[in-house]
């Protein structure tokens, strides 16, 4: 369910969202599709070719990560769908940063502020 929600939220930003068989601690990571150029080569091409578009990557989700497990629990309540999708978008942004890529800073900052506001409103 969480994988489907993340895939819907990300739309065409990634080639695929799939379960990771290799991650043990991280919640997610971005990997290149088989046969595609390395991320480093794509970054170099993008710097030298203004209209170069990065190839879509695969977002691998670790189903055993505590955040992903909690998202799966929350998914049983449809009222949580928006929150789960926002978490999926943030996981993708986190994975982009870990891969040395730049996510949309304005969207990420707004999302993080919303998360912080939700947490702050739960404090006494």
Regions inferred by a protein language model and the residue ranges of each:
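Long, intrinsically disordered, charge-dense linkers/tails
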Residues: 1-124
């Amino acid at each position: 369910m969480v994988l489907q929600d993340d895939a819907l939220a990300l739309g065409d930003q990634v080639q695929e969202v799939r379960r990771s068989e290799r991650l043990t601690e991280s919640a997610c990571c971005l990997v290149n599709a088989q046969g595609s150029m390395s991320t480093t080569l794509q970054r170099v091409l993008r710097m030298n070719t203004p209209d170069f578009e990065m190839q879509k990557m695969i977002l691998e989700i670790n189903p055993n990560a505590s955040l992903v497990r909690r998202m799966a629990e929350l998914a049983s309540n449809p009222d949580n769908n928006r929150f789960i999708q926002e978490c999926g978008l943030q996981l993708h942004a986190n994975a982009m940063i870990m891969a040395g890529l730049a996510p949309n800073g304005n969207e990420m900052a707004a999302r993080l502020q919303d998360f912080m506001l939700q947490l702050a409103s739960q404090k006494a």
